[in-house]
């Protein structure tokens, strides 16, 4: 009972914090502290939830007097618990970074309120136990992201927000259609119950299940930034300030990735024969087009944005394998990418603060005045590229091993080659931005970026610690992967009256 209450608190605390932020009015200093304290409290509860999951297995809470599958159910397993903790840590870093970067005008209005509601949507997506509430929480974080995108009302923000809204309105419409078709087939919305019902379906209904799979893949691939539905991502994520880009780039695409992993495991693993091949094909194309984008641009933000696509593709390769090695690598690499992308965006934000540009052709030589910033970026770049002993190596190792275990050798080779492209793209930023010389550009009077650099360094230190803790984390992550490869434990925890 206590464990169930704690699970709900990860949603209740951000909701209460958001409500309190409304009543505070236009007092940014107080808003900062309220948002930070609320997020820290949520982190404490999330850590306790992880401890309970490791001890007891997946935990659930049923709202109302009904039992599953008829009640509204929230479930936390190892993967969702780790995702929640990582999301909250990144939210804390973004809030702290925003103190000196986002501007008082944005802080006075609904900036922190939107961040809290976006966190609610993300946590809800990771914990909901039914497919319709997954749609609801998707809409919660999407509505919040619309607000964050438009705060500041610059021309580029308004342009990209309109595109972003249109894409997501279409995507959400297809989501509702998919839920409706699925309900017409199985007569339930509970994820675990849907899994049971789908396993009992006759061949006559397989065509409808295939339609549901196609609809869901379109929706979740759009959220995750998968080829060819990624076209909205580079523009929408480029437009807002760096603190908001960090929040979006590190977290939002991972909700789509999680939804693909969960529905493939529970719904389509054994009912749609071509599901793995579709996901693998899209994953490889995402990696390839992400690599092209990463080396085509000189803009530091664009380079890292296209690296998001590469990472999503790599994770989906592991998910498509749906074996222990693949899911272990996918889970670890997802957490790694969330942390390292946050670090890189925060570091690029500091570089922009100094140079007032993100174009590598217009600045250089930063290492002379900002050596800590430069070498921190170098460490984050090595981690992103998967150079051992940093965290990117371990996840990719397991994913590549999974492809070889399944006989998908070309897929494994593409993942390995993508590491070289990633390394080239980020080392190019390091060499040109910190050691390069641009004609006509001289480093101006030193800008005070100590506070922002401290937050960015702290984020990178967390990433390094995550990599160095791989031996401790992998037994936990392997247990989390088993829940996806064999979802019976998840199903039993929801429907078995635990």
Curated annotation (Swiss-Prot):
Q: Name one GO molecular function term.
A: antiporter activity
Please list every transmembrane segment annotated in the UniProt record, as residue ranges. 5-25, 34-54, 72-92, 109-129, 131-151, 174-194, 211-231, 232-252, 277-297, 303-323, 331-351, 370-390, 407-427, 457-477
Instruction: Identify the keywords attached in UniProt to this record, alphabetized.
Output: Antiport, Cell membrane, Hydrogen ion transport, Ion transport, Membrane, Sodium, Sodium transport, Transmembrane, Transmembrane helix, Transport
Membrane topology term: Multi-pass membrane protein
**Gene Ontology BP terms:** ATP synthesis coupled electron transport; sodium ion transport
Q: Where in the cell is it found?
A: Cell membrane
Cellular component GO terms, alphabetical: plasma membrane
Q: Give the chief site where it resides.
A: membrane
Entry similarity comment: Belongs to the CPA3 antiporters (TC 2.A.63) subunit D family.
NCBIfam families (UniProt xref): PRK07691.1
**Subunit annotation:** May form a heterooligomeric complex that consists of seven subunits: mnhA1, mnhB1, mnhC1, mnhD1, mnhE1, mnhF1 and mnhG1.
Name this protein carries in UniProt? Na(+)/H(+) antiporter subunit D1
């Amino acid at each position: 009972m206590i464990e169930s209450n704690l699970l709900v608190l990860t949603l209740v605390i951000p909701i209460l914090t958001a409500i309190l932020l409304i009543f505070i009015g236009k007092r940014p200093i107080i808003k900062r502290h309220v948002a930070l304290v609320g997020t820290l409290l949520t982190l404490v509860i999330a850590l306790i939830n992880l401890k309970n999951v490791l001890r007891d297995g997946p935990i659930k809470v049923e709202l109302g007097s009904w039992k599953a599958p008829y009640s509204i159910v929230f479930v936390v397993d190892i993967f969702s618990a780790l995702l929640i903790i990582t999301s909250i840590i990144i939210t804390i870093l973004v809030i702290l970074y925003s103190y000196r970067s986002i501007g008082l005008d944005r802080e006075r209005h609904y900036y922190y309120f939107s961040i809290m509601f976006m966190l609610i949507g993300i946590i809800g997506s990771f914990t909901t136990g039914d497919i319709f509430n997954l749609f609801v929480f998707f809409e919660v974080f999407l509505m919040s992201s619309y607000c964050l995108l438009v705060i500041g009302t610059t021309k580029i923000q308004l342009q990209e927000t309109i595109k972003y809204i249109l894409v997501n309105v279409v995507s959400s419409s297809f989501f509702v259609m998919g839920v409706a078709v699925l309900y017409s087939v199985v007569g339930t919305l509970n994820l675990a119950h849907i899994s049971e019902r789908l396993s009992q379906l006759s061949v006559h209904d397989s065509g409808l299940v295939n339609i549901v799979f196609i609809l869901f893949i379109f929706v979740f691939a759009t959220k995750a930034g998968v080829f060819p539905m990624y076209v909205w991502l580079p523009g929408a994520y480029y437009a807002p300030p760096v603190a908001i880009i960090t929040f979006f780039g590190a977290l939002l695409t991972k909700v789509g990735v999680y939804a693909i992993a969960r529905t493939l495991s529970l719904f389509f693993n054994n009912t749609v024969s071509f599901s793995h091949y579709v996901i693998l094909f899209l994953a490889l194309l995402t990696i390839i087009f992400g690599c092209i984008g990463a080396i085509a641009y000189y803009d530091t933000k664009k380079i890292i944005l296209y690296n998001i696509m590469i990472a999503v593709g790599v994770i989906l390769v592991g998910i498509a394998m749906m074996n222990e090695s693949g899911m272990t690598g996918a889970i670890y690499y997802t957490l790694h990418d969330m942390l390292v992308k946050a670090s890189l965006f925060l570091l690029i934000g500091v570089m922009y603060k100094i140079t007032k540009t993100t174009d590598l052709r217009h600045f250089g030589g930063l290492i002379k005045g900002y050596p800590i910033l430069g070498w921190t970026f170098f460490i984050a770049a090595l981690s992103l590229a998967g150079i051992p002993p940093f965290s990117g190596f371990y996840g990719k190792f397991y994913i590549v091993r999974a492809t070889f275990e399944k006989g998908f050798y070309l897929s494994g080779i593409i993942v390995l080659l993508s590491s070289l492209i990633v390394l080239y793209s980020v080392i190019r930023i390091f060499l040109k931005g910190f050691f390069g010389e641009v004609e006509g550009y001289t480093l101006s009077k030193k800008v005070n970026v100590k506070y922002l650099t401290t937050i960015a360094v702290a984020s990178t230190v967390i990433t390094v610690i995550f990599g160095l803790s791989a031996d401790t984390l992998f037994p936990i992550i392997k247990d989390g992967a088993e829940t996806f490869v064999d979802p019976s434990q998840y199903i039993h925890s929801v429907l078995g009256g635990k």
